């Protein structure tokens, strides 16, 4: 069992605003948010098709116009994590928590706040997930040529940022093919979250999941890359792959992963059903965004996104500790009979948890006649 908690201070940064349209998955019939708009200074139109959605449960944001934000909101980053082997013989999960990138990397001129997180759920042994934990920071911020931080976050920077993420995942995949201690049957999922000022970027390959809490409502920031995800199923079948009992080519439960070169080697890079390329989602954080949960399938196999958000939100209102919230979410998954390795990271965007407003008591006023007042005074005087 591993617990950790860190915290950094807030600072000011120029950012952009994005207008988003959100639609919930079929199992969340009550949830429908037509529009989230931060300010009029910047607009972003929604694009994408049913075949290539960009976000987890239907959220899509694509920037078309960039400007300086009129909002004063700057997130204050603090996080906590929890990991447990459960009933498995080995622990194949690993994770990264960096609440202050500038302090961690030193030579980079990051905006403040800046933070980076990752969850890696290994299979076929722990080596692939360990490799990601030990090397991904270097791959992201050195080998993939992380873009220079501009004075104002614009569309060009966001495109470069997305490209550097894709390159980092590809470099990790290729490096693992050359790593002698990682066997060809060993691999890992990879879920990362990068925060720069108010900008949040989530990259995912596999079935770990990132879930944002927006005023108590769960917003999936990533897809689960499994046979149940229809766009992935079609992609696999178009490339000649197949599913047997939900497993890719009868072997693997996920359709995207780092490593697993025994499955990738018979194909060229463009035709392998199993790929390492991440799906990427970007969003601008607002005052409505309370926290982000990153967790492996040991959590999501037994808890819905909304149940997890409600659990963490209640915990933050009780004690305000993201580390304890991560542990409590893991314990809830264990109570629901999850036997898999589990890893949870809870990332808060404010220093003080939001509390529900208490209803004001109604003030009652009474009018008393002179006769009634005289009788009351006489009663009190004992007459």
UniProtKB/Swiss-Prot annotation:
One of its GO terms (molecular function) is metal ion binding. PROSITE patterns: PPM_1, PPM_2. It catalyses: O-phospho-L-seryl-[protein] + H2O = L-seryl-[protein] + phosphate; O-phospho-L-threonyl-[protein] + H2O = L-threonyl-[protein] + phosphate. Keywords: Hydrolase, Magnesium, Manganese, Metal-binding, Protein phosphatase. Mn(2+) 1 binds at residues 121-122. Mn(2+) 2 binds at residues 121, 297, 340. Pfam families: PP2C (PF00481). Binds 2 magnesium or manganese ions per subunit. Its EC number is 3.1.3.16. Residues 78-349 form the PPM-type phosphatase domain. InterPro entries: PP2C, PP2C_BS, PPM-type-like_dom_sf, PPM-type_phosphatase-like_dom. Its cofactor is Mg(2+); Mn(2+). It comes from the Eukaryota. Belongs to the PP2C family. This is Probable protein phosphatase 2C 13.
